[in-house]
């Protein structure tokens, strides 16, 4: 295989999606082919782009028949040599200082929009909402992935009937997500010996795992990657805020005061770390009586609307209580799949439409 073939392939991969007007061929410092192992050394324009460049290289060259392994290496970006300037003849007013970011947020290659689904507390149905929202987006014709980032309580394997499923990797050590119901799915639960195995990780371990899930997974081209976050405002949320370019967050709550008190903290946290809050989903909003078809607001009515108005948020939709949701979830069948004509499924499809419109308006 000629070096020129590699260079030509790398010319087609650019860094324009991270605001840098260069292609990968311009960053190459060395190329070697020993047997069927291709080694390429890059000098990135700045630090923090290594995972993105590595993923783009594998996408560009991974299908070459002569190559069985690609080893991507990096040298540190060369520091700019300061230019000596003459002292000004008269004192000048310095230009206003702009605050430099303390971290670099990176895009996941091939993924247009990353939507984080969070909540202030557990028990509000966040994971069920994230799972059915992902399925609903897929049914609208979007290419969708679902990442179970709820590392302390991964429930996606149960919700999709994937208990005991194990992840595999390709020849380039990229994680291959599991596919079901038209989604590409990845969960920490796929990597545990059993569903009873606890995850006892500190912040650095969480950061490493999430980074691997996002940037070392073969997601392909996705319109949406839905992330099911753990409840609260802990290490996972901070890691994402510092390292990943999210389109925004969706918060899930129930109408109870105790849930609303905690979801306010979640909204404040997202805003504190400059993650846009795209809207609120009200779960368990009401119960439809089978006999008279009337709506009964078991946990009260109007509280979520008051909260949304106070915080300047959009209500994406309200989901009724339905015993079928829990029953089918335990069997690994999202309600949008098992009962597409139910009020709950219709609510999820409506929310997916509204969310996609919110995202498009934000982008435009």
From Swiss-Prot:
InterPro entries: Mrp-like_CS, Mrp/NBP35_ATP-bd, NUBPL-like, P-loop_NTPase, YlxH/NBP35. ATP binds at residues 120-127. One of its GO terms (molecular function) is ATP binding. Keywords: ATP-binding, Hydrolase, Iron, Iron-sulfur, Metal-binding, Nucleotide-binding. Residues 83-92 have a biased composition (Low complexity). PROSITE patterns: MRP. One of its GO terms (biological process) is iron-sulfur cluster assembly. CDD domains: Mrp_NBP35. Pfam families: ParA. The keyword Iron applies. Residues 83-102 are annotated as: Disordered. The keyword Hydrolase applies. Binds and transfers iron-sulfur (Fe-S) clusters to target apoproteins. Can hydrolyze ATP. Homodimer. Belongs to the Mrp/NBP35 ATP-binding proteins family. This is Iron-sulfur cluster carrier protein. It comes from Aquifex aeolicus (strain VF5).
């Amino acid at each position: 295989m000629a070096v020129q073939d590699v260079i030509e392939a790398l010319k087609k991969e650019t860094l324009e999606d991270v605001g840098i007007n260069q292609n990968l061929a311009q960053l190459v410092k060395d190329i070697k082919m020993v047997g069927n192992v291709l080694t390429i050394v890059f000098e990135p324009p700045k630090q923090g782009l290594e995972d993105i460049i590595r993923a783009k290289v594998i996408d560009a060259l991974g299908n070459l028949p002569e190559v069985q392994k690609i080893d991507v290496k990096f040298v540190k970006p060369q520091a700019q040599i300061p230019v000596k300037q003459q002292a000004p003849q008269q004192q000048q007013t310095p230009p206003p200082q702009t605050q430099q970011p303390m971290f670099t947020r990176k895009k996941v290659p091939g993924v247009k929009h990353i939507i984080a689904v969070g909540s202030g507390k557990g028990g509000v149905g966040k994971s069920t909402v994230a799972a059915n929202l992902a399925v609903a987006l897929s049914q609208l014709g979007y290419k969708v992935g679902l990442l179970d980032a709820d590392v302390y309580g991964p429930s996606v394997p149960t919700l999709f009937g994937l208990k005991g499923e194990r992840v595999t990797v390709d020849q380039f050590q990229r994680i291959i997500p599991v596919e079901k119901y038209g989604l590409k799915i990845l969960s920490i639960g796929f990597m545990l010996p059993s569903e009873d195995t606890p995850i006892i990780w500190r912040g650095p371990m969480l950061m490493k795992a999430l980074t691997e899930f996002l940037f070392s997974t073969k997601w392909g081209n996705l319109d949406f990657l839905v992330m099911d976050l753990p409840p609260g405002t802990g290490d996972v949320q901070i890691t994402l805020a510092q390292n990943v370019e999210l389109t925004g967050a969706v918060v899930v709550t129930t109408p109870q005061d105790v849930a609303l008190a905690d979801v306010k903290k979640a909204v404040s946290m997202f805003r504190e770390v400059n993650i846009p809050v795209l809207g609120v989903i009200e779960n368990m909003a009401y119960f439809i009586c089978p006999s008279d078809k009337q709506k009964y607001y078991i946990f009260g009515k109007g509280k979520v609307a008051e909260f949304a108005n106070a915080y300047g948020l959009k209500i994406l939709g309200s989901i009724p209580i339905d015993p079928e949701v829990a029953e089918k979830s335990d069997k690994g069948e999202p309600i949008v799949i098992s009962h597409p004509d139910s009020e709950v499924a219709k609510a999820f499809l409506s929310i997916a439409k509204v969310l996609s419109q919110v995202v498009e308006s934000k982008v435009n």
